[in-house]
Curated annotation (Swiss-Prot):
Catalyzes the conversion of uracil and 5-phospho-alpha-D-ribose 1-diphosphate (PRPP) to UMP and diphosphate. Binds 1 Mg(2+) ion per subunit. The magnesium is bound as Mg-PRPP. The keyword Magnesium applies. Uracil binds at residues 193, 198-200. PANTHER family: ADENINE PHOSPHORIBOSYLTRANSFERASE, URACIL PHOSPHORIBOSYLTRANSFERASE, CHLOROPLASTIC. This is Uracil phosphoribosyltransferase. GO terms for molecular function: GTP binding; magnesium ion binding; uracil phosphoribosyltransferase activity. 5-phospho-alpha-D-ribose 1-diphosphate binds at residues 78, 103, 130-138, 199. Its cofactor is Mg(2+). It catalyses: UMP + diphosphate = 5-phospho-alpha-D-ribose 1-diphosphate + uracil. Keywords: Allosteric enzyme, Glycosyltransferase, GTP-binding, Magnesium, Nucleotide-binding, Transferase.
Length: 208
């Protein structure tokens, strides 16, 4: 499994504000969108290009445009939605899928309650989005669901990851590249990332 750590100064600056408990929902959403957008630069660095010609106001110019497979952004509900919004500003023609999972508070295992993907997901470059890679259970299940529907070469994007979550993905999906903004210390007894930033979904939507 390959891990790409996006440690750009702008990402780390915005991540500092995401971690701050004083940051309210509006600012948190905007920051998370911006971090996701900045992370996408690295996650999509290997997209294919082809040459074509356009007419500038002065003369014809040889330029490069995206080619190859079309893109799909797949959010793990609900927190992954905020990452979709940021990345869509860069690739507005990408299709969007949703996978609904919740974590059982006793076992910490994920439970699927919803899935809706582009019908041609097997023909697209898919990016699985979830701000927090904690135990890795939800991301692992989501990756399995994507593979069952023919998706290959899926990249997992998470703002924060715990070592336990990375180990789980390496074990279950060693062919997956994980793109993260930070790797934190550990999980606590409740399965939260330490030091983390709290419950991303609650902080995005102002819920408890």
């Amino acid at each position: 499994m390959r891990i790409t750590l996006v440690d750009h100064p702008l990402v780390q600056h915005k991540l500092a504000h995401l971690r701050d408990k004083r940051t309210g929902p509006k600012d948190f959403r905007e920051l998370a969108e911006e971090v996701a957008m900045l992370m996408a630069y690295e996650a999509m660095r290997d997209l294919e290009l082809e040459e074509t010609t356009v007419e500038t106001p002065i003369a014809p110019a040889r330029v490069k445009v995206l080619s190859g497979k079309k893109l799909a952004l797949v959010a793990i509900l609900r927190a992954g939605l905020v990452m979709v919004e940021g990345i869509l500003k860069l690739v507005p023609h990408a299709r969007v899928g949703h996978i609904g999972l919740y974590r059982d508070p006793e076992s910490l295992n994920p439970v699927q309650y919803y899935i809706k993907l582009p019908p041609d997901i097997a023909e697209r470059r898919a990016f699985l989005l979830d701000p927090m890679l904690a135990t890795g259970g939800s991301a692992s299940l989501a990756l399995s669901l994507l593979k069952e529907r023919g998706a290959t070469g899926v990249k997992l994007m998470a703002i924060l990851a715990a070592p336990e979550g990375l180990e789980r993905i390496a074990k279950d999906h060693p062919d997956t590249e994980v793109v993260v903004a930070a790797i934190d210390e550990r999980l606590n007894d409740h399965g939260y990332i330490v030091p983390g930033l709290g419950d991303a979904g609650d902080r995005i939507y102002g819920t408890k």
